[in-house]
Design a protein with these regions (language model features):
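Active-site beta-loop-alpha junctions enriched in small/polar residues
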Residues: 33-37, 61, 93-95
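A gly/proline- and charged-residue-enriched helix-loop-helix capping module
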Residues: 78-127
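N-terminal amphipathic alpha-helix/helix-capping segment at the start of soluble metabolic enzymes
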Residues: 1-31, 77, 98-102, 118-121
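Conserved small/polar residues in nucleotide/adenosyl-binding loops
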Residues: 136-138
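Residues that scaffold, gate, or flank divalent-cation-dependent active/transport sites
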Residues: 26-27, 34-40
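Short, acidic/polar
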Residues: 39-50, 124-131
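Conserved, mostly hydrophobic/aromatic
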Residues: 24, 56, 91, 133
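Glycine-rich loop at the start of a catalytic domain that most often binds anionic cofactors/ligands
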Residues: 45-47, 66-78, 102-105
Length: 138
């Protein structure tokens, strides 16, 4: 991945840039549609391509719960599973530590999540988060 500044404003901290990944080039600032579970509601990958979307935001925690890392891994990663050849930005699931705090227990070693889907418990450490990202090929 490579980032370069294309222009900046001398009177402020504003700037434009270009992020180059193996999957696409993204001009910044950028509108990034949210596909929490790997899909953007109401829009197909073809629709996103027609709109010149070069990056989608997804969420590691939600992908882990549904459809699950095993299914994504068996399909050779999130890009192939989604039939999406552009860039995907995923977060680590850290936001859910706080947004779902009433269902979580934070320890010195990690976070015990209680699934909002079925109540099952899942313990996430930084290493577990990286393992999930690796399994879905991000």
């Amino acid at each position: 991945m490579k980032f370069s500044v294309l222009s900046d404003d001398k009177d402020s901290l504003a700037r434009t840039g270009l992020i180059e990944t193996d999957h696409s080039k993204i001009e910044t600032p950028v509108f990034m549609p949210v596909g929490t579970h790997g899909v953007v509601k109401t829009l197909s990958p073809n629709d996103l391509n027609d709109l010149d979307v070069n990056i989608m935001l997804s969420n590691t925690y939600h992908l882990y719960l549904r459809p699950g890392t095993e299914i994504i891994h068996k399909n050779n990663g999130l890009h192939k599973f989604l039939k999406w050849n552009k860039s995907i930005l995923t977060d680590s699931g850290g936001y859910q530590v706080f947004s779902l705090s009433n269902m979580n227990e934070i320890t010195d070693d990690g976070v015990n999540f209680r699934s909002h889907l079925d109540g099952s418990e899942h313990f996430f450490t930084p290493e577990k988060s990286m393992e999930v990202l690796s399994l879905i090929h991000i």
